[in-house]
């Protein structure tokens, strides 16, 4: 799996393109290696940095694997439960939210889950689950208060006073599809191919 990934990465680099993110099968292969005790720092870096966040199929596999680690259903030396929770917190929402809420409900690693969820705003219906937990779970209450205070926004770095931009002026009626391969692109990093 790794050999094929690195070959493809090199081929894309030669074309001036970033590597494609890992797909669901590749993420599952990495999870299987960790579960069988063959995990490595190299695989951890790929799992942390090369899986698309959100609701991609690969993100689903990653979130499920990390959830099992966080709930201590499986274990690996390189990814203790606290690290798994932190990694879920970097996935920007999507499948990671359900996993984090499941861990929050156990009342174990609550501080870690709270830290991860305080800065995750794409939680959709899971908001109600966390809201309902706040009377019996201090960390759920902490998350709700953090969202109410907009900590996810106010803790961001200040916007620069001056930003240099390139503006494209297109005459007539237009939309972003004129600058994007839209449904034809595998990912947003492929946009430079069009321009």
State each model region's role.
Residues 34, 38-43, 192-195:
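Active-site-flanking structural segment that lines cofactor/substrate pockets
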Residues 113-195:
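Fe-S-dependent hydro-lyases/dehydratases of central metabolism
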